[in-house]
Amino acid sequence: MGILRKKKHERNASFKSVLTSILATQAATFLLLISGVSLAGTAAAFIATMPLFVVFSPILVPAGITTGLLTTGLAAAGGAGATAVTIILWLYKRATGKEPPAVLSKVLKKIIPGAAAAPRAAPAAAPAAAPAAAPAAAPAPKPAAAPAPKPAAPPAL
């Protein structure tokens, strides 16, 4: 039974622990008082302004609905614009076979982060070990890249 029950050690309260308890009690009382005053003020303001909300509800409800619709419309327009810019850049790349001018990429990065062309691959890091005195063989020359064939022009409308 001695293992399950631990003996409580009695000790005398020090001045520091008594002072800490008194200050903590005062702080908790002050915070509780501030909380009560805040709750009472909120309830009083709610009671005082409720008639105004009832009287002006024919104006406030449509204004809230209009604000919501305007916000939704602006968000939809922004999304459609960003999508249009992305599609135009994709068409430009497909038609010309080259990247769009850097100005468009900068604008696109501001509109849609991460949607602009991916950066070119960085060169590989140098090996950690010291290089050999002389390479065993010379690296093979890279074949010249052939230009991409241009697609046929779309028919005129």
UniProtKB/Swiss-Prot annotation:
The keyword Nucleus does not apply. Residues 138-157 have a biased composition (Pro residues). The chain crosses the membrane at residues 22-42, 45-65, 72-92. Residues 119-122 are annotated as: 9 X 4 AA tandem repeats of P-[AR]-[AP]-[AKP]. Disulfide bonds: none annotated. It comes from the Eukaryota. Sequence repeats lie at residues 119-122, 123-126, 127-130, 131-134, 135-138, 139-142, 143-146, 147-150, 151-154. Residues 2-20 are annotated as: Polar. InterPro entries: Oleosin. The keyword Membrane applies. Residues 137-157 are annotated as: Disordered. GO terms for biological process: post-embryonic development; reproductive structure development. Its main location: other. Keywords: Lipid droplet, Membrane, Repeat, Transmembrane, Transmembrane helix. It is a multi-pass membrane protein. It is found in: Lipid droplet; Membrane. GO terms for cellular component: membrane; monolayer-surrounded lipid storage body. Residues 21-138 are annotated as: Hydrophobic. The full-length protein is found in the tapetal lipid bodies of immature anthers, the proteolytically cleaved C-terminal product is found on the coats of pollen grains. Highest expression is in microspores entering and undergoing mitosis. No expression is observed in male-sterile plants, green tissues or roots. Belongs to the oleosin family. Many of the major pollen coat proteins are derived from endoproteolytic cleavage of oleosin-like proteins. PANTHER family: OLEOSIN. This is Oleosin-B1. The gene is OlnB1.
